Amino acid sequence: MKLLEDRIKKDGQVIGTDVLKVDNFLNHQVDPDLMADLGHEFYRRFSNEPITKILTVESSGIAPAIATAMEFHKPLVFARKHKSLTLKDHLYTATVYSFTKKTSNEIAISRKFLSADDNVLIIDDFLANGQAVEGLMDIIAQAGATLSGVGIVIEKTFQKGRKLLDEKHVRVESLARINAFENGQVIFAPED
C-alpha cells in the first residue's frame, strides 16, 4: 500500500537492523485518517470472507483493528495482556513473546466474546516472528471458532513470522512488506 509505505519513509525511524519505530502515526500517537485508510484496505482485501469478529492484541493493534471493525460493521475483541478484577474467570488464554519488548505475556479473552459460531479476522500492527498471531490463533482454536485470515499493517519479511503462518496455510495480507533495513533506510518488498 503506497500510502503506508510513503508514511513509513517519511516518519518511520529504523533502529538497528531489525526494529522500525512508527510511534508518531501507529503505536503511540495515532493518525486517524491513516487508520481509516488501513481499515478500508483490509475490508477491500477480506470483504469476501464471512467475518463476524475482528481480533487483535492490546495495545498497538487496537487502532488499525477498530478501523477495520468499523468497515466491516462487526465487533472488535482485543486480547488483554493484564488480568483485572473484571477479567479473571472464564477466559481463553495463550502465552505470547514480544519481539520488541523481549518479554512473554499471557493474553486473555473472555469466553463470552468468542464462540464456535465466529469467523475471525486477526489484525495486528507488525508481523515479525509471528508470536502474537500464533497466540491469537491458539485462542481462536480454544473457542472452536474459524480463522478467516490475518491482516498485518507492517510485515518484516526477513523474520520468520510469514513462513510460520504459510506453513499453517493461513491467509496473510500485509499492507507494507519490508525486506530489510539498510543504512537506516527501509527496503520494501515489491507489491504483488
Swiss-Prot record:
User: What reaction gets catalysed by this protein?
Assistant: XMP + diphosphate = xanthine + 5-phospho-alpha-D-ribose 1-diphosphate
Q: What is its EC number?
A: 2.4.2.22
| Intracellular or extracellular location(s) | Cytoplasm
Q: Looking at the UniProt record for this protein, which Gene Ontology cellular component terms does it annotate, in alphabetical order?
A: cytoplasm
Task: Report keywords, A-Z.
Answer: Cytoplasm, Glycosyltransferase, Purine salvage, Transferase
Respond yes or no to whether keyword Cytoplasm is given for this record.
yes
Residues noted as binding xanthine in the record, renumbered to the chain: L20, N27, K156
* UniProt keyword Glycosyltransferase, yes or no: yes
Please give the superkingdom of this protein's source: Bacteria
Transmembrane residues, as ranges? none
Pathway given for this chain reads:
Purine metabolism; XMP biosynthesis via salvage pathway; XMP from xanthine: step 1/1
In which residues is 5-phospho-alpha-D-ribose 1-diphosphate bound?
A128, N129, G130, Q131, A132
List the molecular function annotations (GO) for this entry. xanthine phosphoribosyltransferase activity
Q: Which GO terms describe its biological process?
A: purine ribonucleoside salvage; xanthine metabolic process; XMP salvage
Concerning InterPro entries, the annotation shows: PRibTrfase_dom, PRTase-like, Pur/Pyrimidine_PRTase, Xanthine_PRibTrfase
One Pfam family here: Pribosyltran
Mainly resides where? cytoplasm
Q: What class of enzyme is it?
A: transferase
Which family, according to UniProt?
Answer: Belongs to the purine/pyrimidine phosphoribosyltransferase family. Xpt subfamily.
Which NCBIfam families does this UniProt record tie to the protein?
PRK09219.1, XPRTase
* Complexes and interactors: Homodimer.
Q: What does this protein do?
A: Converts the preformed base xanthine, a product of nucleic acid breakdown, to xanthosine 5'-monophosphate (XMP), so it can be reused for RNA or DNA synthesis.
Name this polypeptide is given: Xanthine phosphoribosyltransferase
